[in-house]
Amino acid sequence: MNEIACYQQLIEQHLYGKLGAVKLLRYIELKSGHSDNGHAWIGCVTPSKTGRTLYFNGRGLMKRKGQRRGESGGNYVDMESGESYWVSGVKKNGQDRHWAGSGKVLVESAALSEYLKVIGAKTLDGTRCEVTSTIRQTDIERLSRLANSSGKGWPVDPEKARNPYSFQRNVSRAKE
């Protein structure tokens, strides 16, 4: 059974959230201001019940509505900062970064064994990737409340919005 069918079956059987958090292996790349050279990770994301929000590295990434890519080329947007991200499944050939991009992809240490299985390798290619243990915990409860609060996030009626493909930022990110 493929990943999507398995996920849909959990939702239909009302088991989502009762069996522990669903984790999906994904490639995540920051697009805002970086084109194809932004920071990039391979790690486990936790999807919301609808699958429209992914939680990873302290962020809530909401799927863009309408056209798949915004001005920056991303298909997800950080609900707090408004930064654009590209999120996709990992490629079996291990060449996840765009051909025009550069920089190493950080592989989450907790996802390393699963990633190596997917690409059919025994070791990581050190010229393209490196292992990291700096992935932050994500406060899913807080971000979920933020995403579901009224009047925030995506416009209720995209047809009436000035730009139906733009995301309305919810809050300002706290200075760390």
Each model region followed by its residue ranges:
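Mixed-charge, low-complexity intrinsically disordered regions
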Residues: 2-44, 53, 59-176
